[in-house]
Curated annotation (Swiss-Prot):
Function: Presumably involved in the processing and regular turnover of intracellular proteins. Catalyzes the removal of unsubstituted N-terminal amino acids from various peptides.
Keywords: Aminopeptidase, Cytoplasm, Hydrolase, Manganese, Metal-binding, Protease
Catalytic activity: Release of an N-terminal amino acid, Xaa-|-Yaa-, in which Xaa is preferably Leu, but may be other amino acids including Pro although not Arg or Lys, and Yaa may be Pro. Amino acid amides and methyl esters are also readily hydrolyzed, but rates on arylamides are exceedingly low; Release of an N-terminal amino acid, preferentially leucine, but not glutamic or aspartic acids
Domain of life: Bacteria
Cofactor notes: Binds 2 manganese ions per subunit.
One Pfam family linked to the record: Peptidase_M17_N
Main location: cytoplasm
Identification of the protein by name: Probable cytosol aminopeptidase
Source organism of the structure: Pectobacterium carotovorum subsp. carotovorum (strain PC1)
Entries under CDD domains matching the protein: Peptidase_M17
Amino acid sequence: MEFSVKSGSPEKQRSACIVVGVFEPRRLSPIAEQLDKISDGYISALLRRGELEGKVGQSLLLHHVPNILSERILLIGCGKERELDERQYKQVIQKTINALNETGSMEAVCFLTELHVKGRNTYWKVRQAVETAKETLYTFDQLKSNKVELRRPLRKMVFNVPTRRELTSGERAIQHGLAIAAGIKAAKDLGNMPPNICNAAYLASQARQLADTYSQNIITRVIGEQQMKELGMNAYLAVGQGSQNESLMSVIEYKGDPNPETRPIVLVGKGLTFDSGGISIKPADSMDEMKYDMCGAATVYGVMRMAAELALPLNIIGVLAGCENMVDGRAYRPGDVLTTMSGQTVEVLNTDAEGRLVLCDTLTYVERYEPDVVIDVATLTGACVIALGHHITGLMANHNPLAHELLSASEQSGDRAWRLPLTDEFQEQLESNFADMANIGGRPGGAITAGCFLSRFTRKYSWAHLDIAGTAWRSGKAKGATGRPVALLSQFLLNRAGQNDVE
């Protein structure tokens, strides 16, 4: 789908469709008022007859409106004008895309980007419109034999901006929005792929393909079990030893800053391509969704793609920690004591708390890069879902400025996160009689104790942890990966690159 921006008056648009907003109760937006005046009150007369109230989600398609050059006008309900916030704006864009697709409008000029959204500028509105449009049109049908194809799908969307001086900002918003949307799609595609296809080797192949596509900036290295053994990554190896699929750690190195002294930003993604729970096996109900336990790695992959596409002037290292936790005679057991790459020992009390074991060795491994910051992304704990639901990602950090950067990026992108504490009281729950620590700390504060566990392996650098167990995928009828938090981390990197146009 093609996107562009222009600045022009609605009456001069010669398009298949013009999209304008209507507020509740039956109040025309400024652009709709202009069209109404040109059409001699045609639109307002329809509203007086009760054709459209203006509630969010409502729409009305008009054909051959008097004195209007465009074939159609699509009226979109925007709710009450003073209540138009970020969430409603995205709902309005989503409704617009669906309505245009359903009615066969292959192109449209959209004036919704001129609506006032409190605290948001034109760049934000255009970028969010692009990202939302791509999200709305996303389908995962690679494995279906009968694919549903629309006869006249929407192919071109032009966003109108109020003044010509905003065209540059609008064009940059489209560029950023398309790159972020492509990263989100890549993450969703990986997450939705079934575990018999998407194993650690598949993740590694995708990482290598990324290096082939962006060969000027990206180098990918894949570390197998033999090298992990030589490195002493025994916790990582223990998790995967019950699987027939080899554990593989894919390291994607992106160099966009020519200064060799610039320290890299490191992103680490948990890549459990299937998590049965191991000996501490999970309940059968919804176990199929444990293919999503690699959404942290999928996120890192999507973000690395975004950075390469935009050629960000940063040095970034993305690590996909690929592994599979299966039940087998060789599987690790509750009661085992593992010596991690850091030299610290861990008593395994639950084999289903495996993500932190994979991550702890990976977090130790990345010390060699002398990173500026390290951010890990993981579907780590059900406790985070209980704490924050399915709407907000859990954030923990050992460095306040980094935490504030991520929270700011979450607000700017609309990909929300909330900070949880990491205090010594929670550390005490990890005490073990037989090792330096246990791999679980009991039910109370489970998301926090998991973060505390990881913090013991991140003392040599600034670190943040994103627990996406509640936000990485949806269940039920709309089951599928969400691609979160690609948008959050993309915004973080844009801010670091000095390309922050968001208000």
